[in-house]
Structure formats: structure tokens, C-alpha cells
Amino acid sequence: MSRRHRAEKREINPDPKFGDLVITKFMNAIMFDGKKSVAERIVYGALDVVESKVKSDPVVLFHQALENVAPHIEVRSRRVGGATYQVPVDVRPDRRRALAVRWLITAARGRNETTMINRLAGELMDAANNRGSAVKKREDVHRMAEANRAFSHYRW
């Protein structure tokens, strides 16, 4: 790990359509090879599909989906006297959001709808209703932390 000063956080502009920073971060995570326009088309298309199916504000549903996927606790490996323990620790708010975004995108890419727009829309609606692969991932992480609660005194 570098001993120099910590890198400064870059200023991110809100997305042009909804004016939401989290949606911008989501777009940046979906983006491949710097193709922001493709990522915008996917995210905005998915939010339009969600709006047409649910008949409510897609941004509220998006934030609800992120909140349902974000983990509160996770396990980290800690080496103590030759043994490696999975120690449950709380997740920082910025990491919570980053993990939720990553898991939502991975789950959407793993679905079998025809286009990425439909896959992402389906995963967002499932996550908002506490279903889907991304929510299952969060529950697995929570279950793992619960199973290793005995090692929580190794927390650092």
C-alpha cells in the first residue's frame, strides 16, 4: 500500500436526465471501454421500461433496489496465529453503495432476457421487490457473517 497522501475524490457531475449522482455512478460502472453514450442508453432505457411497467417514479424504484441489495455487514479474512478467520465487520456507506451497484450489474448481466436494457430493468424491479440474484447475493453475505459471528472479537 502506498505511503503517500490519499488520492482525492474526483468531482462527479449528476446525470443530465434525472440530476442524480448515484445514477451517474451506476452508469460509470456499466460503461465498457469509455463508451458513456452506450451506458447512458442502457440505464435510461432500463429506467423507461421500469416506468412503463410499474407506473411510478423510476428513480425512487432505483434507489429502493439499491437499498435492498446493499449489505450491512460482510466478512473479511484475518490471520491469527496461523489460522485464517472470516471476521464479520460493518460495511462503510460508500462501500455499501459500490457493492450494491456491482452486484446489481453482475446479476443483470447474468439474466437471460434479450437485451441488456430488459435484463437491467428486470433486475431492478426484482431487487426493489426483494427478489432476484442481487438480493440473494446480499443474503448470502449476511448469512456468512452470521455464521462467523463467533469470530467478531477479532475485529480490528
From Swiss-Prot:
<dbReference type="Pfam" id="PF00177">
    <property type="entry name" value="Ribosomal_S7"/>
</dbReference>
<keyword id="KW-0820">tRNA-binding</keyword>
<dbReference type="GO" id="GO:0006412">
    <property type="term" value="P:translation"/>
</dbReference>
<dbReference type="GO" id="GO:0003735">
    <property type="term" value="F:structural constituent of ribosome"/>
</dbReference>
<dbReference type="InterPro" id="IPR000235">
    <property type="entry name" value="Ribosomal_uS7"/>
</dbReference>
<dbReference type="InterPro" id="IPR036823">
    <property type="entry name" value="Ribosomal_uS7_dom_sf"/>
</dbReference>
<keyword id="KW-0699">rRNA-binding</keyword>
<dbReference type="InterPro" id="IPR005717">
    <property type="entry name" value="Ribosomal_uS7_bac/org-type"/>
</dbReference>
<dbReference type="InterPro" id="IPR020606">
    <property type="entry name" value="Ribosomal_uS7_CS"/>
</dbReference>
<dbReference type="GO" id="GO:0000049">
    <property type="term" value="F:tRNA binding"/>
</dbReference>
<comment type="subunit">
    <text>Part of the 30S ribosomal subunit. Contacts proteins S9 and S11.</text>
</comment>
<keyword id="KW-0689">Ribosomal protein</keyword>
<dbReference type="GO" id="GO:0015935">
    <property type="term" value="C:small ribosomal subunit"/>
</dbReference>
<comment type="similarity">
    <text>Belongs to the universal ribosomal protein uS7 family.</text>
</comment>
<dbReference type="InterPro" id="IPR023798">
    <property type="entry name" value="Ribosomal_uS7_dom"/>
</dbReference>
<dbReference type="GO" id="GO:0019843">
    <property type="term" value="F:rRNA binding"/>
</dbReference>
<keyword id="KW-0687">Ribonucleoprotein</keyword>
<protein>
    <recommendedName>
        <fullName>Small ribosomal subunit protein uS7</fullName>
    </recommendedName>
</protein>
<keyword id="KW-0694">RNA-binding</keyword>
<comment type="function">
    <text>One of the primary rRNA binding proteins, it binds directly to 16S rRNA where it nucleates assembly of the head domain of the 30S subunit. Is located at the subunit interface close to the decoding center, probably blocks exit of the E-site tRNA.</text>
</comment>
